[in-house]
Amino acid sequence: MNSSIIRYILGSVLKLEGALMALPCIVSVIYKEEEGLSYLAVALGCLAFGFLLTFKKPKDTVFYLKEGCVSTALSWIMLSIFGCIPFVLTKEIPSFTNALFETISGFTTTGATILDDVESLSHTSMFWRSFTHWIGGMGVLVFLLAVVPLSGGSNVNLMRAESPGPSFGKLVPKLKTTARLLYLIYFGLTIIQIILLICGRMPVFDAITTSFGTAGTGGFGIKNNSISGYSLYIKWVVTIFMILFGVNFNAYYLILYKKFKSAFAMEEVKAYLIIIIVSVVCIFFNILKMSTSAVNAITDSAFQVASIITTTGFFTTDFNLWPEASKTILVILMFIGACAGSTGGGIKVSRFIILIKSLGKETDSYIHPKIIKKIKMDGKPVEHEVVRSINVYFLTFIIIFTVSVLLVSLENKDFTTNFTAVAATINNVGPGLSKVGPICNFGGFSALSKYVMMFDMLAGRLELFPLLILFHPAIIKEIFSVKRKSRV
């Protein structure tokens, strides 16, 4: 294993985190808050460690998927550990476990919180908490590829390890250009949302932090009641942008280059929009009688469907009080998730499409055993290797989910709480149902359960395997052998 390039990547990530921590420091100056000193200290620490790790450039800059997965998993763990230190130093979240949970939830764009009173945080910490969503939304390593030349053609292994979904690839021949293009679209949509929210008389600070949460599909609000206290206009702006950030970014690339027919013909995007429309209609009629008006019913149903399927986690109402049918739809949407190549979480719409087509193919083979039928996506045949990897992904997901529910259930909480808590964390949604509903939090869980859910959040964001590979005996053996060689 090429440990020198892994070390260099980790150092680059630390330097990036240190640089990004300058923003909450600026916020602390604007609001005259002393919490900024803690962020400055951690930022300088990140930069110092980062420079130490990158001082000696690796001679061998070529690495493969194995190194890409290890680099990605370790980068996200390290990013979260250093990112949580300011919360502890400011004593706004004094417990390291709680601070780490909150930070992992931020970077993985989950939005599950342990805080009872979000509004008690300083503006500095509120900003950093929301900013972690924006950093993690498109992926920290994708950002790194956009600004730092790492290792030539091998960069694809970093993007492959971090990118959400089974069909994310290069938009243009040069990977660096792809990364920059992705962030250009990401940044552009974020700025447009901020402007539209400010036009709706939302305070500038609120507009920026809300847009961070929407863009990264994270859902950390700066109000205890999330988005429910804002105007109807703001609710609809957030709804629309949640849906937009849940779309495969390849579609925006095609639109930018005026390939409208190809963009609107994308099978996954069409399925994604159909699922949203059907879900909104079903929930609307289900909650109409209990709503104060039809306008509120359609607003709440559209907002919550968009929030859950994109795994954002904002809320405008306590959907814990909705009828069972509506809550069931929301739980199903948690697992479906957004499109591949978006900032959303969940299993991804494309995986379900291929799985359903695979099921249809197997059924047809029983009826017509001599006919060879290929699975197609957007009119193109899907390689057998892709279908196989999706089947393995589903099996792995089920195993991790089942084990996690069993471990969390040791606390003796009700089944709905345990099931949806794990579903909300592994799918990077945020709120669940019952005791982890939208107006509740995860603070009541034990340290064991919190660490289980931290693992789930990281596994869900990294598409399971980059994190799991750290526990592979061969990788552990290589890591320890590298340590022994370095001592010698």
Please place each PLM-identified region on the residue numbering.
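Membrane-proximal intracellular helices of multi-pass ion channels
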Residues: 1-488
